[in-house]
Curated annotation (Swiss-Prot):
EC number: 6.3.1.13
Named cofactor requirement(s): Zn(2+)
Short sequence motif 'ERGGDP' region: positions: 191-196
Keywords linked to the UniProt accession: ATP-binding, Ligase, Metal-binding, Nucleotide-binding, Zinc
NCBIfam families, alphabetized: mycothiol_MshC
UniProt family annotation: Belongs to the class-I aminoacyl-tRNA synthetase family. MshC subfamily.
Reaction(s) this enzyme catalyzes, per UniProt: 1D-myo-inositol 2-amino-2-deoxy-alpha-D-glucopyranoside + L-cysteine + ATP = 1D-myo-inositol 2-(L-cysteinylamino)-2-deoxy-alpha-D-glucopyranoside + AMP + diphosphate + H(+)
Subunit structure: Monomer.
Official protein name in the record: L-cysteine:1D-myo-inositol 2-amino-2-deoxy-alpha-D-glucopyranoside ligase
Source organism phylogeny: Bacteria, Bacillati, Actinomycetota, Actinomycetes, Micrococcales
Amino acid sequence: MRSWTSPALAPLPASGLPLRLHDTRTGRITPVVPLTPGTARLYVCGITPYDSTHLGHAATYHAADLMRRALRDSGLAVEMAQNVTDVDDPLLERADRDGVDWRELAASQSALFAEDMEALRVIAPETYRSVSEAMDEIIAVVLALHARGRAYPVEAADAAGPDWYLDLAADGALGDVSGWSEEQMLAVFAERGGDPDREGKRGRFDPLLWSAEREGEPAWDAGVLGRGRPGWHVECVCIAEEGIGLPFDVQAGGSDLIFPHHDLSAAHSVALGRPFAAAYAHSGMVGYQGEKMSKSLGNLVFVHRLVREGTDPMVIRLVLMAHHYRSDWEWTDGELDRAAERLKSYRLAARRGDHRPATVEALRAALRDDLDTVRALEALDAWAEGGSSSGAETDPAAPGDVPTAMDALFGITLQS
């Protein structure tokens, strides 16, 4: 699947200092030490392409983009994989509602997402695969789990054959990533795609591994499991393994994926006898009109609509930078006005052309400290006002080109 064209990367020499990132699993901020020396490997969960990119999506992929920029600045090569969930219930339901082929809907919305990412100057992943493209690999993994005795059937009245579930019992307690109690899990499992009360399941949190073919739905042949389509969680395991290998360094995504998706993706990998991710970094939720911004609620602010109405994409990035990536925050129309004023002041400051190594170092220090964009903006505001957040400039040989640093570290170009 075509992703998008990456922006030209500004030529800022690497600092060589490590990124320190909050790991959801441990609850601590620790340095990212690659499992493969010299190369950091990241996986970010992709969209289900049945609607346009909203600011909640943008916040997630902005955070992942900052991670790879920070890792690049630390002197590492970076390999990233990202999926597109183009075979899933919400997409199939939307296609049926609108009377279009599910493949056409997925293709059109994936193309729009790519346009939005390109406008926001997000670096494209090295591996970008849809579920439908990766179906052969997914089926191979599902059959491998069956061969290991980890899959069991549950009768489905509306299908010709049974659905298949992953038996989690052999691996002990669920929740290695989230650390949640069973009560916390049950509170959200059903609304996030689970079916804890389905008759015939061995465990309430056992995830759907292979859904039997239903009338009007796409289906593929999975040998002894019959025709059908994969469950959600196994898909990311397969695309990650194919793209960057298992285990990898950082799993990224929105905080609404901590449970069940990331807990259960890790459980699938463990069931295969392979570790999954070394660390987990999750971005907060963006709210609007008092609720989490989501397709199901319809309270969405779309990136492409803002851009088409004349909003500079760099203003959108500055809106996202104004909130720490792990924070939940509420969108208001005033966010754009404040960010537009910031961008204007930065462009005026860039025309001065003064050399400020301390500002560049302040930007780097903020980014490598758990992607602290709020602190970075404080340094940029001081620079724009003609001052410095870090004292006098004493080393004229140090990198001091603030616009280049903004581009390389934060993806912000001051070219108008």
